[in-house]
């Protein structure tokens, strides 16, 4: 009985000889260690690991090699500095395939404790979907960090229409009244202020920023803080009525079309980041479709 185990990827030739741009695995379950100024965090994520296959006569790559390298790296914090070593090891592990490029994508949710708007003793958890891509090619490494921020948007046109209807209703009801006390007006508004309300919706901003090879952390807190400060209406976690009231005030003070939100982010991010892309989606409550805008191609 033969004790040798066949290795088809090594000993067989492909039926069609052709180079492949990327080959690897997707959907790999991995632990992710994050280091931020807020402290460390361990989360579960998924990864995609790939290399190029320029050798036309090689039938297949050695995916187990990539898996073991990714598994070994998983015990380290996820940083650009550390990822550079992983990418280099991936390329070196496939010298027999003439590989010169490698890339890894990580997908996970970053959890953060956020305080209520007004209640000092109240806070709750928020989850931010994160995507990190690292690609090595031609001796250079590129990093893109993407985070999705959820916020509320209220339609400026709808707000104007609601104000007009409220004003018309007030005038119609008081057409024969020449003078009203402030208290009377306030009482009327408390009873009739919702005569017409503007439509609003949960909205999503996907923000991608370039990172440098020398970065010692991803900078997630700074990026999220910057985006939420620009938008002014991030969705909340735990709230009381006083916090919900403050949120309503923020929405009224920050009426936004999808174009407004995208331009706000474009202007504000340019102060802090040299290279970035913004994709915004408003999950319309008036229409069955979404409104979208972006600063770059998808």
Curated annotation (Swiss-Prot):
It comes from the Bacteria. One of its GO terms (biological process) is tetrahydrofolate biosynthetic process. GO terms for molecular function: GTP cyclohydrolase I activity. InterPro entries: GTP_cyclohydrolase_FolE2 (IPR022838), GTP_cyclohydrolase_FolE2/MptA (IPR003801). Its EC number is 3.5.4.16. The keyword Transcription regulation does not apply. The record marks 155 as: May be catalytically important. Keywords: Hydrolase. Pathway: Cofactor biosynthesis; 7,8-dihydroneopterin triphosphate biosynthesis; 7,8-dihydroneopterin triphosphate from GTP: step 1/1. It catalyses: GTP + H2O = 7,8-dihydroneopterin 3'-triphosphate + formate + H(+). Converts GTP to 7,8-dihydroneopterin triphosphate. This is GTP cyclohydrolase FolE2. The gene is folE2.
């Amino acid at each position: 009985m033969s004790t040798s185990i066949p290795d088809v990827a090594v000993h067989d030739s492909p039926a069609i000889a052709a180079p492949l741009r990327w080959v690897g695995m997707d959907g790999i379950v991995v632990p992710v260690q994050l280091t931020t100024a807020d402290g460390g965090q361990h989360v579960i994520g998924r990864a995609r690991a790939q290399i190029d296959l320029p050798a036309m006569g090689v039938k297949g790559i050695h995916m187990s090699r990539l898996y073991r390298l990714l598994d070994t790296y998983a015990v380290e914090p996820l940083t650009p500095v550390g990822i550079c070593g992983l990418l280099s090891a991936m390329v070196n592990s496939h010298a027999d395939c003439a590989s010169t490029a490698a890339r890894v994508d990580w997908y996970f949710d970053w959890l953060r404790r956020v305080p209520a708007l007004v209640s000092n003793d109240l806070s709750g958890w928020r989850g931010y979907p994160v995507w990190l891509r690292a690609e090595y090619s031609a001796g250079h490494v590129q990093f893109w960090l993407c985070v999705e921020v959820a916020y509320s948007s209220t339609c400026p046109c709808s707000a104007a229409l609601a104000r007009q209807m409220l004003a018309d209703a007030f005038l119609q009801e008081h057409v024969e009244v020449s003078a009203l006390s402030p208290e009377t007006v306030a009482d009327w508004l408390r009873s009739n202020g919702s005569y017409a309300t503007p439509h609003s919706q949960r909205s999503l901003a996907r923000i991608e920023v370039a990172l440098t090879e020398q970065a010692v952390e991803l900078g997630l807190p700074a990026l999220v803080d910057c985006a939420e400060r620009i938008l002014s209406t991030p969705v909340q976690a735990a709230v009381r009525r006083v916090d919900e009231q403050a949120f309503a005030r923020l929405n009224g003070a920050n009426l936004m079309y999808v174009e407004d939100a995208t331009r706000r982010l474009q202007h504000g991010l340019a102060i802090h980041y040299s290279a970035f892309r913004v994709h915004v989606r408003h999950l319309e409550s008036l229409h069955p479709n979404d409104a979208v805008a972006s600063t770059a191609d998808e």
